Amino acid sequence: MIFLSQAQIDALLLEDIQGGDLTTRALNIGHQHGYIEFFLRQGGCVSGVSVACKMLTTLGLTIDDAVSDGSQANAGQRLIRAQGNAAALHQGWKAIQNVLEWSCGVSDYLDQMLALLRERYPDGNIACTRKAIPGTRLLASQAILAAGGLIHRAGCAETILLFANHRHFLHDNQDWSGAINQLRRHAPEKKIVVEADTPKEAIAALRAQPDVLQLDKFSPQQATEIAQIAPSLAPHCTLALTGGINLTTLKNYLDCGIRLFITSAPYYAAPADIKVSLQPAASI
């Protein structure tokens, strides 16, 4: 479970509600008791519910029921029902709707990618990068995990990933073995992940025996060729495809023999359509 602190929950609310809801105040309806319900119009893989519930309870509202993150909702299915003071209901409405729409958009997009991949490779995986929209990293992470995806890198401090931009600063930027051996010495408990930008680099990297080799922006044919020769060069190395991988392009790589894909595409998926209904208690 991704943990969002109370300060982070407060920040999600404060973007919209710090001054209260003027319309509710002007109508003098804030004292009434009521209900709020959130519905997913088009259905799909759900996320953001646990965050939304924390936002609701922060406003002093009571959760009556809620679906679980990662569940598959039918079109029009209710995700959350909560009750409480009408002023708080109206304050939380849009901020919570935004969290649910963005989160569900991310999780459902990734869920569709995983379904496509696992039709071909039941053991296939998709890892999502740290290149999330600024300020959304934790929301993105909970959405990715809800859909069954992997977190590629939560940050740059806990994993090794050798890019060309690192190698540019080495005395010999083509010395893959030297770089990988140095990384193993100085980070002995970590897997060594490297990225290649060309087939020539990929072959040189494989000969240096990394744990994981990322192929960046390789064509399907190039990826297939590397996948065919990799077992003889580095039998224990896992291959991954990255760069331009999305729901549209993924199908072009399903015959190359690689089962791990790395992407940031879900973060930029269209938001889900969340319908919100607020009603006074007497009408329920």
Curated annotation (Swiss-Prot):
It is an enzyme of class 2 (transferase). Pfam families: QRPTase_C (PF01729), QRPTase_N (PF02749). One of its GO terms (biological process) is quinolinate catabolic process. Keywords: Glycosyltransferase, Transferase. GO terms for cellular component: cytoplasm. InterPro entries: Aldolase_TIM, ModD, NadC/ModD, Nicotinate_pribotase-like_C, Quinolinate_PRibosylTase_N_sf, Quinolinate_PRibosylTrfase_C, Quinolinate_PRibosylTrfase_N. The keyword Transferase applies. Transmembrane segments: none annotated. Gene3D superfamilies: Aldolase class I, Quinolinate phosphoribosyl transferase, N-terminal domain. Its EC number is 2.4.2.-. One of its GO terms (molecular function) is nicotinate-nucleotide diphosphorylase (carboxylating) activity. Belongs to the NadC/ModD family. NCBIfam families: modD. This is Putative pyrophosphorylase ModD. It comes from Escherichia coli O157:H7. The gene is modD.
